[in-house]
Amino acid sequence: MIHVTCNQEAFELPEGASAMDLANKMKQSHCFAGALINDQEKDLSTTLQDGDTVLFLTWDDPKGREIFLHTSAHILAQAVLRLWPSAQPTIGPVIDQGFYYDFANLSISEEDFPAIEAMAKTIAEEKFPISRQVFPDKEAALAYFSQNPFKAELIAELPEEVEISAYTQGEFLDLCRGPHLPSTAPVKAFKLLRTSSAYWKGDPSRESLIRIYGVSFPTTKELKEHLHQLEEAKKRDHRVLGTKLDLFSQQTCSAGMPFFHPRGMVVWNALVDYWKRLHQRAGYQQIQTPQLMNRELWEISGHWENYKENMYTLTVDEEDYAIKPMNCPGCMLYYKTQLHSYREFPLRIAEIGHVHRHELSGALSGLMRVRTFHQDDAHVFLTPEQVEEETLNILNLVSELYGTFGLEYHLELSTRPEQGTIGSDDLWELATKALKRALVKSQKPFIISPGEGAFYGPKIDIHVKDAINRTWQCGTIQLDMFLPERFDLKYTNAQGEKSTPIMLHRALFGSIERFLGILIEHFKGRFPLWLSPEHVRIITVADRHEARAQELAKHFSQMGIIVSVDSSNESVSKKIRNAQNMQVNYMITIGDKELETHLLAVRTRDNRVLNDIAVEQFSHVILEELRSLSLTPSL
């Protein structure tokens, strides 16, 4: 017999029992997609060993959902091959909103989707068991996939010592490291979304492929809800709203590098000004480091060796330079300009740095995926004993910042990867436990992702939920044990000796451009007043009312209210519609009555009308709404 632990409960099982056997013993096998066995993702068919710790994964767990979607990608490939046997499957990963599979030697359109979906439904209903097999060596794997040059290329690139596995469901076998569902049966709802062209390995010089995107769910109800969400997302698309509201544009001369218009810069500046006030109150100092630094710096940081293909480089006066893809190395140099003592710690250094990273053109998308963006980084230097308290301070800052925008979020703690890490076991354990204790004290929901940390330390990722329940990974808190050593950073400890500081690297917005894109979609372009590019628009009924309109505009402008005047020849109703289409928060109409009484006729963008409001009363209400960073209108 063997003894295993699941949910802090001990179980006794016979030798050779699998995770599925344990699930059956718990009478819950129908719920589970896979399992974390000793923090490693595994199939339910995995044989358990004495002393194992098991955590089952369901559709509601991110990792369980990933297993479900990965199996769905295999079902897609199997369905396509049944209908087009000469097609060549290449890769089929899980992505944020579902999955895709790339095929060579295939020409289809969306008109073929019903046939593929029907075949996928049949495959699910056939309830094929899904089994894993391991090839004895690389040669055996190459021999099996000899008719598929794409799979063969992937196999050839694997190190000799790597275990090469494949998964079988019915007549279909695919190269894959898994894990997968125990059968095709749980995939009850399957929908294809679109096709696009792609290149093998994202390289335009390689073979052209067709990419098929899809989603799947355990129930038809969940699929319908998701499709409704996709329709709502189209209405909120920041690329469409960004153009309609005159916030930003994209130009062919600079793909992935957005042009921000005056209205967009108003929103941008409101975000940045808020960020600066928040960080000043929290004890951060702000710096600015150069965008262009020489090769020597990037060699010290490790970027030149490991990240060069994503960097923009140039040679000036026979010296190699790179435009910074990250702010961290510049902050390391700033730290070294002075001597430091433990008495200064935590030392909080913040920078909104302009960074550039080369992304493939096919990956670019509005403000969400760009080649240049501003990252709101901060680097906090501290002693090991301060990690927990300072992490909690940052988590409190996270709570305040996202709460200001009305955004819900959850946290994800990623722990030490199996291989390739730096730092001692003791330091990793100390750091991970400190982050976890801070998360518990923050009283915010969090999940643990075993082995998903960076090579230089554990991290906490912040996943934001928007108005239509999509999640976006924005901020991060990373404990870095790497860069302080690479740059030989020192401080004088309490014993008067030189020590290397621990560093917390954190970003709250992440990319300001991306965060702005998220806000556009979250608010559907209807920004709260303090973020709005235009607070008030004054609309004249006739030419004789323009002088009063300009007088009011000057009055409001001097108070810090963003105001414009529409004295065009359009009808009043058309002017109001124009203002509402541009999501102006408040409209003031000036006619003969308002000219005589000096009172205001105010209309909101939701068409609420308020008459006979005194100028000073309106000013006071608007200024208070701005000051309080209110998310709801005061009138």
From Swiss-Prot:
This is Threonine--tRNA ligase. One of its GO terms (molecular function) is threonine-tRNA ligase activity. It comes from Chlamydia trachomatis serovar D (strain ATCC VR-885 / DSM 19411 / UW-3/Cx). Zn(2+) binds at residues 328, 379, 505. Residues 237-528 are annotated as: Catalytic. It is an enzyme of class 6 (ligase). Transmembrane segments: none annotated. Its cofactor is Zn(2+).
